[in-house]
A protein has these predicted regions:
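D/E-rich low-complexity acidic segments and tails
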Residues: 10-34
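Arg/Lys-rich low-complexity patches in intrinsically disordered regions that function as generic
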Residues: 1-8
């Protein structure tokens, strides 16, 4: 017998706005990305701080991917997004850049939590966030099982603005 999951009625679900499709465009919107992998927009065209732009440039990136071009401005404005895209299209940076940009520096109070499905992905997301935080006074901590909890617990006690973790 096949088991199915019971879905919540739409009125109970949290409101979430989807990012515009890569092909969508309007008169007010910037040029639409050509694909999830490609965009004509440079990171310098987005409302990003000099610290973030410097970190992005040091990693050799100048042009946003299609996913990033479609999501950066709504995410920077604080809108909730649901983004689905293929592997390698820049989704991690698409949510890490606005997350790091919107967090105040140096207060050591957790401001953002990113959940990943695996330990390896949690480590990768934390590493990308740390790279973006290079010129901002923001600490990132990865929390996951399979290793001693002592150093992770100490990092939380010391304070960090971004926690990246995985269940289990």
């Amino acid at each position: 017998k096949k088991r199915t999951r019971k879905k919540k009625p739409a009125e109970e679900a949290a409101p979430v706005e989807e990012a515009p499709a890569a092909e969508a465009s309007s008169e007010e919107a910037p040029a639409a990305p050509r694909s999830d992998y490609d965009s004509a927009r440079k990171f310098s065209e987005f409302p990003l701080s000099p610290e973030i732009l410097k970190s992005i440039a040091e990693h050799g990136y100048e042009t946003a991917t299609g996913v990033q071009a479609a999501t950066l401005e709504p995410a920077l404005a604080g809108r909730d997004l649901v983004v689905r895209s293929k592997t390698g299209t820049g989704k991690t940076a698409a949510f890490c850049i606005p997350m790091v940009e919107r967090i105040g520096s140096g207060d050591r109070v957790t401001r953002a939590i990113a959940l990943a499905p695996t330990r390896e992905l949690a480590r990768q997301v934390a590493a990308e966030c740390e790279a973006l935080c290079k010129y901002k006074d923001i600490r990132v901590t990865a929390i996951y099982g399979g290793v001693g909890f002592g150093s992770q617990e100490q990092a939380l006690k010391d304070g960090c603005e971004i926690v990246v973790g995985t269940p289990g």
